[in-house]
Amino acid sequence: MYKRQAYRFSFSWPRLYPNQDGKINSLGLEFYDKLLDTLQEKNLLPFATFYHWDLPKYLDDKGGWTNLDTLKRFSEFSNLIMDKFGKRIHSIATINEPWCVSWLSHYWGEHAPGMKSIEATAKSMHNILLAHGNAVEIARDYGHKNVGIVLNKTHVIPQSNKKEDAFAAKIYDEIHNTWFDEAIFKGKYPINLLSILRPYMPKNYSNDLKIISKKIDWIGINYYT
């Protein structure tokens, strides 16, 4: 029988901060304390994700990932996790699939908040990466040395050899793949997509790229067939 060595889970933001007053839910802390105790008893390494899409409703009502206040609150949430549980977590993923949080949710409208807005898309595509960078910094401040992010990838092929199809494929590759890769690993955004999104991006977005590109230890890949 295959012996499991690790358990991947996410911290639920609404469970720990159920209300907008910022008060911490002690029962939520107790839940994760017991979970980590159980994992230790079972000799399972905790692989924790800070954000796997469960945004508190009170933040969604104020614009969610298009609102900079959400980033401030996410940093508070990340700091709480590290303060209470950081030494007991083997591996940290800051964000699960930021493409889903941004493009899929704000341009295609298939996930919450179900928007179809290019402006909201541009802001969320940048802000979710800035939230990642802030979380990396927080984890480093607590001395953690096993920090990464999980990205979902897709293979893009032009429909034909026509120039317009090749360009369309390039744009979609930047939307789904290289927007996140280049920001995280190179501290820049791919030029073609940026030329489209720049009018809608947050002011002074380029100043954030140093934070977004903070060194990480690994990258997780989700690839669906």
Predicted region positions:
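Conserved small/polar residues in nucleotide/adenosyl-binding loops
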Residues: 1-5
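Short hydrophobic-acidic sequence motifs that mark active-site Asp/Glu residues
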Residues: 6-8, 220
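Active-site region of glycoside hydrolase catalytic domains
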Residues: 19-20, 33-225
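Glycine-rich, proline-tolerant flexible connector loops at the mouths of alpha/beta enzymes
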Residues: 11-26
